[in-house]
Amino acid sequence: MPNNSSDSSSILHCSFCGKSQNEARKLIAGPSVFICDECVDLCMEIIREDKSDQLEKKRGGVPTPMEIKSTLDDYVIGQDNAKRTLAVAVYNHYKRLESNDTSADVEISKSNVLMIGPTGSGKTLLAQTLARLLDVPFTITDATTLTEAGYVGEDVENIILRLLQAADNDVEKAQRGIVFIDEIDKISRKSDNPSITRDVSGEGVQQALLKIIEGTVASVPPQGGRKHPQQEYLQVDTTNILVICGGAFNGLEKVIEKRSSKHHGIGFGATVRKNSKEESVNVLLKELEPEDLLAFGLIPEFVGRLPVVATLEELSKEALVRILTEPKNALVKQYQKLLEMENVKLTFTDGALEALAQRAIERKTGARGLRALLESTLLDIMFEIPSKQGVREVVINREVVEKQIEPLLIYAEEALEANA
């Protein structure tokens, strides 16, 4: 006679719902406990809902365009038109994500952004400030390192991997992040003529970026690098990821001028325009049309997926002086804080600030070059001050910047008496 009691005792059960191994599709073993696949799914759903609730509470609503611009004003000087354009685009994008309206009669597409402006005009800083304001994952990618799949270089999927890493590998959080692709103008089509060699870092990369910009489920290798058949992939939906592309687009103003000059005619009835040398790049960029980007080398599908275009102006000397002193993280304030830790006051005269701005313009580095100029100007001071006794104030004037002479050091009275 068979022993049924021993057979029943060998059947394993889920420690949570009590289902036997025969009733469950999968039973996962732990230290003296078991859990079935249905309980795992239920636990995942509870965690997912909890995360979603926490995210909603943390977000507390999307800032209005005016609030977004006000925050950008605290960190970025000038560029009002670009700020307004970005504020509206970002507001509409995240408002679209927050909307619970799932009706199929109106589908709002995402507003990816193309920022065009010279080096050091604030493109990267604007994107970074937006991500910090919205408290979303953010990553910066250099488009020049990207190549088509199968060629030496970075795969496009690595952009999503970096965003995932910025989100602490939280897929849902990454799917609401911001990607900034810099130097996008460097992947313009090299030539209109067909060639026997493949353009793997130009048009090929534009084609590869299309799906990520528009929205797709990307298969991302969790450890990065190239894809392997045996590797497990993370599935990331890029539909709700805001993509901001930026580039200097040097020479684009010539394309705009060439296109616009065709509409003015020739002869006695022609409209008289100023000489192109007298027209600033800023004015020409305001006349930008999609056909100009096509002529520059971007493919039609790529231009069509970047509906919002924000143009940034070349920074004037006055704007660069304001950048040195006004933002919350202004460079002058940072160096003043560093010397304040040594109980020394750092003072810049108006002439010194103007000289720094003028040198940045001459180097064509914009605001990005200001830090390097300040570093070289203050190097000796930062080296010597910790060892000098009794220094109360350091004054930087125009001659210190232009001629690299010693700055004026003001000592405390008691230090002067001791030296006497």
Swiss-Prot record:
Pfam families: AAA_2, ClpB_D2-small, zf-C4_ClpX. GO terms for biological process: cell division; proteolysis involved in protein catabolic process. Transmembrane segments: none annotated. It comes from the Bacteria. The keyword Zinc applies. Signal peptide: none annotated. Keywords: ATP-binding, Chaperone, Metal-binding, Nucleotide-binding, Zinc. PROSITE patterns: CLPX_ZB (PS51902). Coiled coil: none annotated. The keyword Aminoacyl-tRNA synthetase does not apply. Gene3D superfamilies: 1.10.8.60, ClpX chaperone, C4-type zinc finger domain, P-loop containing nucleotide triphosphate hydrolases. Belongs to the ClpX chaperone family. NCBIfam families: clpX (TIGR00382), PRK05342.1 (NF003745). Component of the ClpX-ClpP complex. Forms a hexameric ring that, in the presence of ATP, binds to fourteen ClpP subunits assembled into a disk-like structure with a central cavity, resembling the structure of eukaryotic proteasomes. ATP-dependent specificity component of the Clp protease. It directs the protease to specific substrates. Can perform chaperone functions in the absence of ClpP. This is ATP-dependent Clp protease ATP-binding subunit ClpX. It comes from Magnetococcus marinus (strain ATCC BAA-1437 / JCM 17883 / MC-1). The gene is clpX.
